[in-house]
Structures are given as C-alpha cells and as structure tokens.
C-alpha cells in the first residue's frame, strides 16, 4: 500500500494478564472485584454479580497477538480493554480506582510491544470522575478511551454525561463506542444472536439517541469512533431523518451528527463496506478486526481489498485515516520486544 504509516487495526481487545493474575493471587485487591480460576483461565465478577466468560487466550497471551499481527501484515494495532471487565457495576470511588489500574495495565503491556497503541478506560458510571480520568491520561501515549453504550442505568445522551462529553471535546480525545449485550432479551437466546445481532442493536439504539440529542455535533472535538461499522445506523439513517422531519422541534438533525462519526470496517461483506464508505465518506472508515474473538474479522484486510473501491480509498481505510485520527500515538512503531511462541488459538 502507499500509506507510509502502514496498516493500522483500530479494533482489538486485551485483558492484561499481569493485573488478572495479581488479583487472583491477592497481590492486588479490590473489595468488589473477584477473580477466579475456571477452565484453565480466569473469570472476573464485580460487586457479587455473575462472572464473565473465561478470558480467551488471545486476550491475555501477547505471543498469540504478536504472531497474528505478523501473519496478517498489520503494522500497528489499537488495543482496548474487554468491555466485560470495565467494571461499570462498581461503586464510583472503587470504579475510578479500577479504571486507573486497568488503563495502566493496558499501557504497560503496549509499552512492551511498540506496535500496540493503548486506549484507556474511564469510570463511566460517574461522569464527573470519567471526565477527570480523561483529562489525567498521558495524551501522547493514550489517545483516548473505549466506552460502553450506557452506564449507571443512564443512556449516553443523558445530561448527566455532559462533563464527560465536555472533557472529550476539550481534549480532542478518541472515544470508541463499543456495545455490550444489554439488548439481549430472551429473543436472542438462540442461534448465537447475542453476537450476531443484539450487540448491533445496542449500538444502533445508542447512536440514534446520540444523534437525536445532537451530542456529536455539540462536541466536535470528541473523535467518536463506532464499532462494527456503526451497527444498522448507516442503513437506517434515512428513516431517522424522516422521523426527525416529522418532529423537528423534538430531535436534532441526525445527518449533522452522523457526519461527525468514524467507523471501523468490521462488516465482513465487501458490498456492505462499499455502502458504508459511500454513506460516511472514505475518510471516515478505518480497518478493524475485533481481535481475538471468533465473531471478529480475523483476516481484516481481505474485506477492504475485495471491495470495489479506488486504491486511494483502500489506503485511507487500511492506515491513512487511523494515522491521522490517532495522531502522534500512531507514529512509526519501535521494534517489538521478543515474545514467547504462541501457546494456543484465540477464541472467545
């Protein structure tokens, strides 16, 4: 490709093994964080709630990640925490401390491999503390944060989140919006529909609310990136516009805020990627994999290279757009430190 900054995968997850093992061994303690061994891995539970699924090897094994990056011809990878361990269930103070511990652990592991770019976390259940955490991050090293679609029982368009959005706007921070499984009613219990559809519904509803509330347009300094190609949003935007025209006094123009969004390429189908590029613009789409999960695109360059797009647009998606959005953090990487050989397959 022609882009000097190489190929950048902006959508990948990690669970810092050092922090997890320290918690399991009692070397690090949080009152409401419970880490236990299960099926040769670990689970994490918050505030007495149900445990997560066992941590996938690809989340914790740096050797697997390093080998995969080389195999796929990916120069840099933006790594974010696994949403299941963000700890939004925790009390505000403990949640703030947990967010710091998780962000520092992510930053430490990326420092050991110059190809990795960290995104932090914030205690989104307390918007004031989330704003403070965003301001306190080392900007040159951590260009932004990943957040879920809701926290503390509130939607992201709730006025309570104003301090967070103001902080993101002022800091020019990347805010990567990632769904959970909050939309997974019993209707999604079969056929793998939690991953196949519920997460996309979660994103789409959150985005529709943000657009109608005018949040992206009101805070243009916040670089809002959306996972999984924006869910269904690009396809239903016309309907949202029609709904706005019926009630223009009660909703902001969704097109104005849609134009502020950035998207990853995790859509799998070249025709869908072509539609996304046509709808959002070639400067608004970036390569993503959702590594290490099977529902992700673990050969992410393929969909870009198969899409009927000009080579200039492919180059933008494969690296140019991300290099611009992530700024100095996406500069040419230093050589990675030696890694152990891969010990297994990445699996969710």
Short names for language-model regions:
Residues 2-10, 17-76, 104, 108-111, ...:
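Mid-to-C-terminal alpha-helical segments outside catalytic/metal-binding sites
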Residues 8-10, 77-79, 117-120, 145-147, ...:
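Hydrophobic faces of well-ordered beta-strands that scaffold small-molecule active sites
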Residues 13, 150-151, 180-181, 230, ...:
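Catalytic metal-binding/acid-base residues of hydrolase active sites
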Residues 13-57, 183-201, 240-258:
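Active-site gating loops and adjacent loop-to-helix segments of metal-dependent hydrolytic enzymes
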Residues 75-206, 346:
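Active-site gating/metal-coordination segments in enzymes
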Residues 147, 192-204, 217-218, 224-230, ...:
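Active-site core of metal-dependent hydrolases
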Residues 211-214, 218-256:
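Aromatic-lined glycan-binding groove of carbohydrate-active enzymes
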């Amino acid at each position: 490709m022609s882009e000097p900054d190489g190929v950048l995968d902006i959508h990948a997850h990690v669970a810092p093994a050092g922090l997890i093992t320290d918690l399991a061994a009692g070397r690090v303690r949080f009152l409401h964080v419970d880490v236990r061994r299960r099926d040769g891995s670990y689970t994490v539970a918050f505030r007495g709630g149900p445990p997560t699924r066992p941590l996938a090897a690809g989340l914790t094994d740096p050797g697997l990640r390093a080998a995969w990056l080389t195999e796929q011809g990916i120069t840099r990878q933006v790594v974010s925490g696994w949403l299941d361990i963000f700890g939004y269930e925790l009390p505000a103070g403990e949640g703030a401390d947990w967010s710091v511990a998780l962000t520092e652990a992510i930053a430490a592991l990326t420092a050991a491999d110059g190809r990795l770019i960290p995104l932090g976390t914030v205690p989104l259940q307390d918007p004031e503390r989330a704003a403070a955490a965003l301001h306190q991050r080392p900007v040159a090293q951590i260009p932004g944060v990943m957040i879920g679609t809701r926290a503390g029982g509130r939607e992201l368009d709730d006025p309570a989140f104003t301090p967070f959005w103001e902080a993101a706007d002022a800091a020019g921070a990347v805010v990567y919006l990632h769904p959970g499984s909050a939309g997974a009613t019993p209707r999604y219990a079969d056929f793998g529909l939690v991953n196949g559809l519920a997460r996309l519904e979660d994103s789409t509803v959150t985005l529709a609310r943000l657009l109608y509330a005018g949040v992206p347009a009101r805070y243009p300094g916040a670089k809002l990136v959306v996972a999984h190609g924006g869910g269904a949003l690009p396809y239903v935007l016309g309907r949202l516009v029609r709904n706005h025209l019926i009630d223009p006094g009660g909703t902001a123009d969704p097109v104005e805020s849609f134009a502020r969004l950035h998207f990853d390429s995790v859509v799998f189908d070249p025709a869908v990627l072509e539609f996304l590029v046509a709808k959002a613009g070639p400067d608004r789409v970036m390569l993503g994999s959702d590594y290490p999960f099977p529902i992700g695109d673990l050969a992410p360059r393929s969909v870009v290279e198969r899409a009927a797009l000009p080579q200039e647009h492919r180059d933008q998606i494969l690296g140019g757009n991300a290099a611009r959005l992530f700024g100095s953090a996406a500069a040419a990487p230093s050589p990675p430190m030696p890694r152990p050989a891969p010990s297994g397959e990445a699996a969710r």
